Amino acid sequence: MSGTAASPHDVPLSDRRAQDVPAHWLLARLGKKVLRPGGRQLTTRLVGMLPLRGADVVELAPGLGLTARLLLDAGPASYTGVEGDTDAAAIAAQSIGARGTIAVGDAKRTGLAGASCDVVLNEAMLTMNTNAHKGEILDEVSRILRPGGRYAVHELALVPDDIPLASAEDVRLSLVRSQKVNTRPLTTPEWQSLFAAHGFVVEQIVHAPMRLLHFRRLLADEGVRGTLRIAGNYLRDADVRRRVNTMRAAFQRNEKHIAAIAIVARKATASTPGSAGEAAIQETP
């Protein structure tokens, strides 16, 4: 996932106070490149699970463009990113250059032609939408996918599957307050039911620990130099430091109840209708 990195002043909302910025853009301001719940490892694994060579690929909310480069390296026929933030779209376009196309658009209404792609992928995006908006996004993905096309996501899950409703709401509110985004993770069965309700057959599920701000994960995702850069920026700004500490505390407090989840689902056809049945579920250490 190498390539041109955005400077702290290029990332969206770089003019806002640290306490007001959504968590992912605050971390990008620090110089963090990998912003997904399961880190570089789960993203790489998810991309490797997809039939990308010769495929028409769409990525929703490509952000800084790191996953876009992984997708492009797999040899698709075409790549289109649809990004809702104009600043992020500019960063992603710079990241991939002439290898693909970045459009500014809404994941619920992409403006893309129906049945025009084979694979759609998004990361850490459905989680940040209400349940109603999740459904609208899945309907849009179904519209633009060809029959039998794959939809892949890398999101946040609540664990265990039978977490009490009160505990789930406590986790959600804690994440909303610390992340400054409308974080609404689901349990694995709830994710499966959501996909089935909108015409998808879930084929594969992979879980991984949610350790976005753990030191070992930082090293694995960012490398030694990247981790040192992040640490330097963290130490130089007291407001950023306080906000990151709040985020880390929320993650640690809820660590037993949140995990990263990757899902690959197939657009159902008349002969293979959607189902919330068994999928291959794997755990990543």
Regions found by a protein language model. Give the residues of each.
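Conserved alpha-helix/loop element of class I SAM-dependent methyltransferases that forms part
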Residues: 36-53
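Class I SAM-dependent methyltransferase SAM/SAH-binding core
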Residues: 64-109
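A short acidic, Gly/Pro-enriched loop at the edge of an enzyme's catalytic core
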Residues: 108-120
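A short glycine-rich, Lys/Arg-flanked "PGG" loop and its adjoining helix->strand segment in the class I
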Residues: 135-150
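Class I SAM-dependent methyltransferase Rossmann-like catalytic core
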Residues: 21-38
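Conserved catalytic/acceptor-binding region of the Class I
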Residues: 148-210
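Conserved class I S-adenosyl-L-methionine
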Residues: 55-63
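Conserved Class I S-adenosyl-L-methionine
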Residues: 204-285
